[in-house]
Amino acid sequence: MSSKEQKTPEGQAPEEIIMDQHEEVEAVEPNDSAEQVDPRDEKIANLEVQLAEAQTRERDTVLRIKAEMENLRRRTEQDIEKAHKFALEKFVNELLPVIDSLDRALEVADKANPDMAAMVEGIELTLKSMLDVVRKFGVEVIAETNVPMDPNVHQAIAMVESEEVPAGNVLGIMQKGYTLNGRTIRAAMVTVAKAK
């Protein structure tokens, strides 16, 4: 028997064993190289993760800033609207005593006296003109009776027993109240009905 023909105990020729082992080594080598990651690839992967995190943070920051700007714009619009609505408040507060004086003049005027008729008519027209002007700018008079007492627009001065007006309702107006665009600038001083 030649050396090529020599058989190993397993029944294989030595060349066959060497070839089998060589194939196994070749099969193992690609696996080893796959396990060894190129450091550049690892660095690229880390940088991609960092980039994604930075983009997420920037997106969140941009959204937060947009929301803050929208809130600021809305608050500014509301402030401007309130400034327009209530810019006249001080001026109206100065006019209220004049309107009250005209009201009192009409209350005490002798309307039966023909000599006073022209003066009473002049006061009535002046008061009407004044109220028309302030109504144009959002001022409303609070002077209704027989309505439920509302602490937002009424200030109770006294409680008076009454059979005609339900308890808790406004019985009489001592001094008119006024609102400016829905905001009470002076509460009406009222008497409130109570049950007997």
From Swiss-Prot:
Q: Which InterPro entries match?
A: GrpE (IPR000740), GrpE_coiled_coil (IPR013805), GrpE_head (IPR009012)
Database matches in CDD domains: GrpE
Pfam families, sorted? GrpE (PF01025)
GO terms classed as biological process: protein folding
| Protein keywords | Chaperone, Cytoplasm, Stress response
Where is the protein localized? Cytoplasm
* A Gene Ontology term for the protein's cellular component: cytosol
Question: HAMAP family, per this entry?
Answer: GrpE
The family assignment reads:
Belongs to the GrpE family.
Q: Please give the function described in this protein's UniProt entry.
A: Participates actively in the response to hyperosmotic and heat shock by preventing the aggregation of stress-denatured proteins, in association with DnaK and GrpE. It is the nucleotide exchange factor for DnaK and may function as a thermosensor. Unfolded proteins bind initially to DnaJ; upon interaction with the DnaJ-bound protein, DnaK hydrolyzes its bound ATP, resulting in the formation of a stable complex. GrpE releases ADP from DnaK; ATP binding to DnaK triggers the release of the substrate protein, thus completing the reaction cycle.
Q: By what name is this protein known?
A: Protein GrpE
Whichever gene encodes this chain, its name is: grpE
